[in-house]
């Protein structure tokens, strides 16, 4: 899923780059407001989850401020690429034992301590990406941008 996530994030950045700053930041009725706001929220969420899963520094921004996590488009693109590369390297080192462990943290969203199997947390992180990329895809389509295929079986390194 890390490879798929990286592939899709690259494609989405290329698609979003066709828009100007005003179009990227335009309110579009999505939960995180704009295309760029939704993308920033996803980057923020990856950093939150990786702080729990692999000891990364947690973002200082709170959930409600996550749409502004990275406001500059060039900085966003750089951080997204670095983040995806780090997640890919981390995922390659996971073992069955790692996946079988529980992960405990305080969830601000749930308002309590959580203990969940690490494998479920990892699936959630990638599922969260897919959920919001679907929203971004819909916003891009509404803005007249043709989006690339998102089917997992079409990922280039899976297609023979």
Identify the residue ranges that each predicted region occupies.
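Short, contiguous alpha-helical
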Residues: 2-66, 108-160
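Helix-adjacent hinge/juxtasegments
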Residues: 57-99
């Amino acid at each position: 899923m890390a490879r798929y996530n990286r592939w899709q994030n690259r494609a989405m950045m290329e698609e979003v780059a066709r828009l100007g700053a005003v179009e990227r930041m335009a309110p579009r009725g999505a939960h995180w407001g704009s295309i760029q706001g939704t993308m920033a929220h996803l980057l923020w969420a990856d950093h939150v989850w990786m702080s729990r899963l692999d000891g990364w520094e947690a973002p200082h921004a709170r959930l409600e401020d996550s749409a502004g996590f990275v406001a500059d488009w060039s900085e966003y693109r750089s951080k997204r690429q670095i983040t995806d590369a780090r997640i890919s390297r981390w995922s390659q080192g996971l073992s069955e034992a790692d996946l079988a462990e529980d992960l405990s943290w305080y969830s601000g969203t749930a308002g309590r301590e959580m203990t969940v199997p690490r494998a479920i947390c990892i699936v959630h992180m990638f599922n969260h990406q897919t959920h919001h990329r679907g929203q971004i895809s819909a916003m891009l389509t509404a803005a007249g941008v043709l989006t690339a295929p998102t089917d997992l079986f079409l990922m280039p390194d899976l297609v023979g």
